[in-house]
Amino acid sequence: MNFRRRFIQLPLAAAVLTLGAASAWAQGVTLLNVSYDPTRELYVEFNQAFAKHWKAQTGQDLTIKQSHGGSGKQARSIIDGLEADVATLALAGDTDALHTNGGWIPKDWQKRLPHNSAPYTSTIVLVVRQGNPKGIKDWDDLVRPGISVITPNPKTSGGARWNYLAAWEFAKRKYGGDAKAKDFVTRLYANVPVLDTGARGSSVTFAQRNQGDVFISWENEAYLLEKEFGSKVDVVYPSLSILAEPAVTVVDKNVDKKGTRAVAEAYLKYLYTEEGQDIVGRHFYRPAISEKAKAKYAKQFPALQLFTIDAAFGGWEKAAKDHFADHASFDQIYIKK
C-alpha cells in the first residue's frame, strides 16, 4: 500500500517538475556580459543578433545585459561578486585574474575557444585634432614640450596598458634598451594632464571636453570618434604598435550557479560565426577568424607594423609584474598632478 502510494506520487512530482521547468523556460533567461569600455556599440548589435539566433534555435527568449568600464576594474568587480556570465575583457591578463583571485575560471581558460579565445583583435593608434595642427606623426611627438596627451590609467584600464606598452616598445627599439624606454614614457606621462579610469572616459575628455592635443586610443574607438566627430578629429597611425588581443570566457562559477552555461557558451561561440565576425568588423575591430570578414574589412585597416605582448614582454603575467604591479615601472615614472 505504501509502495502503491509512493508509485502514484512519483509521476505527479515529475509532472510538477516538468511544468516548473517549462514555466522557467518560457520566462526566458538573462545573461550578463561584463566587458571593457569601448565595446558598448559592438555588443549592442551583437546581443540583438545572438538573441534572435537563440530564439530561433531554442524558442527561448533571451535578455542580455551589458556592463562596461576599465578592464581592470571590471575584473575586480567580478572577483568581488558581480555575477557575470561572460567576461569579454581588454586583455588576457585581466581575465587571468579571475582564476588567480578566487578560481572563477580554470587556469587553461584560453584553450577553450579558437585563437586563444580572442575572436577579434585591435591595435593602438593616435587621434589628433582635425588637420593635425601639432604635426603629430609618431610616438616620439608625444614627448615634445607643450604637447598634451590624453590616455587612461593603466592601473584600471586594459586599453591604457596596451597604450603604455606600445610606447615603451617603440622607444626601446628606437633609442635602445629599457632604460631609454623608461625615460621616454616618463616624459610622455609628464605630458598627460589627467588619467581617466577607462578608455571611454578618456575619449569623452578628448572629444567632448576638448582637452589634449592627442588621444592614445583603441583603433576601434578612434574610428567611432571619427564617425561621430568627423569634422573635428583625424586618426594617425604610428610607425609601430601592439597587436591587442581581447579575450573572452564564460565565468564558470557563475554560470554553474545560475544554470546558464549552455547559453553563455553558445553566446561566445557565436562571435566566431560569419555573422559574429561581420558585426565585429562593422564596429572597427579586426576579425580574427573569418577570412570572408577579414577580406571585407581589410581596406578600413591600414597596414601597420605590429608586435605581440609575448614577443616583446614575455606575456601578460611578466608585463604586469614588471610594469603595472605596485612599485613597478608605471608607479616609478608617473607623478600625480
Task: Name what the model sees in each region.
Residues 1-14, 22:
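Twin-arginine (Tat) signal peptide motif
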Residues 27-156, 335:
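N-terminal segment of the mature folded domain
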Residues 34-36, 128-130, 148-174, 188-192, ...:
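Short beta-strand->loop
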Residues 38-42, 46, 74, 90-94, ...:
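Stable alpha-helical elements in mature extracytoplasmic
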Residues 47-56, 79-83, 92, 99-103, ...:
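Sec-exported extracytoplasmic/periplasmic mature domains
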Residues 131-137, 156, 169-177, 254-262:
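Short helix-loop capping/hinge motifs at secondary-structure junctions, enriched
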Residues 173-240:
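Ligand-binding pocket segment of bilobal, Venus flytrap-like solute-binding proteins
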Residues 255-337:
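Extracellular/periplasmic juxtamembrane helices and adjacent flexible linkers that interface
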